[in-house]
């Protein structure tokens, strides 16, 4: 597939990719590259990677670097770290590395950021968790200003950062509170909602975001499955999240946030309608659950070939109303 909607564009349908930790490191990279290629073949506009450290729960320590690996393997489409943990690394480094990746892949890079909450991430990177919210509040407008080209901050002499003035990099923030969505609106970023939050909660937050002047794309993450869903493995994943998520966030989790159906047309309608109910203009699909085999992901990707274009069509039709 040669055409795709730009990074984080309204109507876009993207895929979250995760490492299969039963494989060795080299095989993990190659499998993720293969899945990124397959995602493009079935119509996904782009792919996202996300971050935790120390091999935690099948996440990556280097989501931005992995995005570069995936872009090299993909025939068009976009990729990005989403979310990258903004509070465990120097702000300037986030800006520079993202801008230079975009210099290599013009128009194909995006960035999503989060504050983080897992204690091990801070310990492994020898960064105190204390004060992390304040660090995030300080870093967010700096990253947003530099990568949007509005304000290069201290990095105006960097050629890749300077290029953002005419080629801004789309950005989003993982935000699940009223304060956080207002902060994203002020920074000119879009929103990324986690895969467990209720649709009602997401709608409250998107309404607050729009009411605060937010103009970016709101993206709903949802687990999607063709056929009978892997309910027991999904429950294992939720248990992992419960082990470190803030108690306040868990009060807004849905009992069953997986969207599944055996009929592609029905599933596409379910996904698009769910996004619309949440006030979101784009969808990010997750297939990964604990213990899933590479072959299962590939089979699901093939089965989604009739779903992804239909979801995009419905999202775009809703935006035109």
For every predicted segment, state its role.
Residues 26-38, 97, 175-182, 264-274:
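Short, acidic/polar
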Residues 39, 43, 51, 70, ...:
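Conserved, mostly hydrophobic/aromatic
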Residues 4-10, 57-84, 135-139, 302-319:
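Alpha-helix-loop-beta-strand connector modules within alpha/beta enzyme cores
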